[in-house]
Amino acid sequence: DADFNIVESASSGFVSLNLSDDIDNDEGYRLVVGKNGVEIYGKTEKGVFYGIQTLIQMLPSNIYEKSNSSLVSSVVIPSLLIDDAPRFSYRGMMLDVSRTFFDKEYMLKFIDALAYYKVNTLHWHLADDQGWRVEIKKYPKLTEQGAWRGAGEVLNPAYGSGNERNGGYYSQDDVREIVQYAAERNITIIPEIDLPGHSKAVAVTYPEILCDINTI
């Protein structure tokens, strides 16, 4: 995150963000670097956002450093013109948090990385045999028990999780925050609950959902 001063008239070295009907693709952009500064044009805010990502990719990596000794005081970008638009409207990544759980803080960083590479869809695999990861208030045992693996847990250790209690889940507020955070970065989240297949985490916490073999 960064803070920017918004001004009505620009001086040398400014970055100007503009909406333009001259851009054909809703996610396309034009990036112009000239002697007076940087201009980014997009047909929509999405296009402008992707133009900003390209500009960021031109900057040295130590702009992300938190140490004052590593901070960049100035950056010189050569004059250039980039007209860019996505070839594919769906640019997705799938993250399986059932088999390997990643907490909310990791998810937010992961979403930042997706935005950096202009990925616009996150397929979020929230439930499988190895863990249930989203809070359902009507069925609390899904996360009280079904979100944890280890010796003595209802789910056995798997995928290198070890014998100690391992796992976690997202509260409903966590999910809302993650979805909003992604939307602000032009990323749509597709949540996946793997049912009725791969439903061990449900079956061991609420066995009453299982079919009675004698009635089949």
Which residues fall in each region the model found?
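Short, solvent-exposed loop/turn and secondary-structure capping segments
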Residues: 51, 105-107, 124-126, 133-138, ...
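Short, well-ordered coil/turn segments that N-cap beta-strands
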Residues: 88-91, 118-120, 183-187
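A conserved hydrophobic secondary-structure block that centers on an alpha-helix together
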Residues: 93-129
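Aromatic/hydrophobic pocket-lining residues that form the small-molecule binding cavity
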Residues: 48, 107, 171, 175
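Contiguous, structured surface segment used for ligand recognition
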Residues: 1-88
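The substrate-binding groove and active-site-proximal loops of carbohydrate-active enzymes
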Residues: 42, 92-104, 157-172
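Aromatic- and acidic-residue-enriched carbohydrate-binding clefts of CAZyme catalytic domains
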Residues: 86, 130-184, 199-216
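Aromatic/hydrophobic pocket-lining residues that form π-stacking "cages" and hydrophobic walls in ligand
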Residues: 110, 178, 189
